[in-house]
């Protein structure tokens, strides 16, 4: 698709609709709505809110992991498992 865009310099309405549909399918709440299509503005707002919630969740998990690592013996099997997961 990017090669089609670069040769024309613009994106078609059909391509935009396809991208919006793909975006909608990635949002957890959008799946529950079934086939009803949300407005593009609402969908973009939901996407931004979802991304923000994912950032908060990552931050929370990072804090929890830091707290856990601070209380563990750094030579324990649990600490080694966590380190190996973080390396992968």
From Swiss-Prot:
Keywords of the record: Brassinosteroid signaling pathway, Cytoplasm, Growth regulation, Nucleus, Transcription, Transcription regulation
Traits of the deletion mutant: Erected leaves with reduced lamina angles associated with lower cells length, reduced internode length and small spikelets and grains. Impaired response to brassinolide (BL).
Compartments (UniProt record): Nucleus; Cytoplasm
Main location: nucleus
Superkingdom in the source lineage: Eukaryota
Signal peptide: none
Entry's Gene Ontology BP terms: brassinosteroid mediated signaling pathway; positive regulation of unidimensional cell growth; regulation of brassinosteroid mediated signaling pathway; regulation of DNA-templated transcription; regulation of leaf development; regulation of seed growth; response to absence of light; response to brassinosteroid
GO-annotated cellular components: cytoplasm; nucleus
Induction field: By brassinolide (BL). Accumulates in the dark.
SUPFAM superfamilies: HLH, helix-loop-helix DNA-binding domain
Tissue-wise expression: Expressed in seedlings, lamina joints, nodes, roots, and floral organs including anthers, young panicles, pistil, lemma and palea. Expressed at low levels in leaves. Preferentially present in leaves lamina joints.
Residue span, bHLH domain: 1-54
GO molecular function, one term: identical protein binding
Keyword Transcription regulation: yes
Functional summary from the UniProt entry: Atypical and probable non DNA-binding bHLH transcription factor that acts as a positive regulator of grain size. Involved in the brassinosteroid (BR) signaling pathway. Binds the transcription repressor APG and forms a heterodimer of antagonistic basic helix-loop-helix transcription factors that regulates grain length and weight by controlling cell elongation in lemma and palea. Contributes, together with LO9-177 and BC1, to the promotion of leaf inclination and grain size by modulating cell elongation.
Miscellaneous comment text of the record: Plants over-expressing ILI5 produce increased grain size, caused by elongated cells in lemma.
Assembly with partners or alone: Homodimer. Interacts with APG. Component of a nuclear cell elongation controlling complex made of ILI5/BUL1, LO9-177 and BC1. Binds directly to LO9-177, and interacts with BC1 only in the presence of LO9-177.
Homology family: Belongs to the bHLH protein family.
PANTHER family with a match to the protein in the record: TRANSCRIPTION FACTOR ILI5, TRANSCRIPTION FACTOR PRE
Protein name listed in UniProt: Transcription factor ILI5
Gene designation per UniProt: ILI5
């Amino acid at each position: 698709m990017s090669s089609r865009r670069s040769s024309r310099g613009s994106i078609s309405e059909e391509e935009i609709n396809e991208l919006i549909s793909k975006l909608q399918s990635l949002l957890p709440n959008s799946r529950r709505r079934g086939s009803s299509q949300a407005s593009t503005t609402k969908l973009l707002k939901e996407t931004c809110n979802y991304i923000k919630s994912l950032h908060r969740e990552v931050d929370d998990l990072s804090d929890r992991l830091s707290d856990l690592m601070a209380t563990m013996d750094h030579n324990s099997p649990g600490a080694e498992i966590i380190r190996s997961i973080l390396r992968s």
